[in-house]
Amino acid sequence: MRCPFCGQDDTQVKDSRPTDDNAAIRRRRACPGCGSRFTTFERVQIRDLVVVKKDGSRSTFDREKVVKSLQIALRKRPVEDDQIERIANGIYRRLESLGENEVPSKLIGELVMDVLMEMDQVAYLRYASVYRNFREAKDFGDFLGKMGTSSGD
């Protein structure tokens, strides 16, 4: 595997082990060229999922987009990176279990929101503000009002 820091082609695997949910192999690697260490994940890909966007365009499902959006929503929250990886794996497995080759982007967003609602309401609000395209403070207030009534408060 190529080193992401210096670009050298040959890196050494120092440690391999399954992730907690057994959905991937975590490999610690070292670059003999620059001495950097980094982690890679190896996953089985059964088929390519295609995401159908709101405008009708299609693109291959990118698990890293889910991870990055979770990282942004959970920034400075008490959540470890491995938890974020497990959440992304769970969302991917749920999408694959549908048995469809194409999934609407709306479904992915809703799955992320469902997980965040249960896990961390601050992260849920952060994600919702982008996903639901909040434009002004009133949008937050309206959404918080709906959150309060839907959670039985």
Swiss-Prot record:
Cofactor(s) essential for the protein: Zn(2+)
Zinc finger (unnamed) positions are 3-34
Q: Where is the ATP-cone domain?
A: 49-139
* Stretch forming the signal peptide: none
Tell me which UniProt keywords the record has, alphabetically: ATP-binding, DNA-binding, Metal-binding, Nucleotide-binding, Repressor, Transcription, Transcription regulation, Zinc, Zinc-finger
Please verify whether the record's keywords include Metal-binding.
yes
Q: Which GO terms describe its molecular function?
A: ATP binding; DNA binding; zinc ion binding
Relay the cofactor remark from the entry: Binds 1 zinc ion.
Q: Highest taxon of the source?
A: Bacteria
A Gene Ontology biological process noted in the UniProt record is: negative regulation of DNA-templated transcription
Under Pfam families, the record lists:
ATP-cone (PF03477), Zn_ribbon_NrdR (PF22811)
Q: What does this protein do?
A: Negatively regulates transcription of bacterial ribonucleotide reductase nrd genes and operons by binding to NrdR-boxes.
- Protein family: Belongs to the NrdR family.
Please report the name of this protein according to its UniProt entry: Transcriptional repressor NrdR 2
**Species lineage:** Bacteria, Pseudomonadati, Pseudomonadota, Alphaproteobacteria, Rhodospirillales
Gene giving rise to this polypeptide:
nrdR2
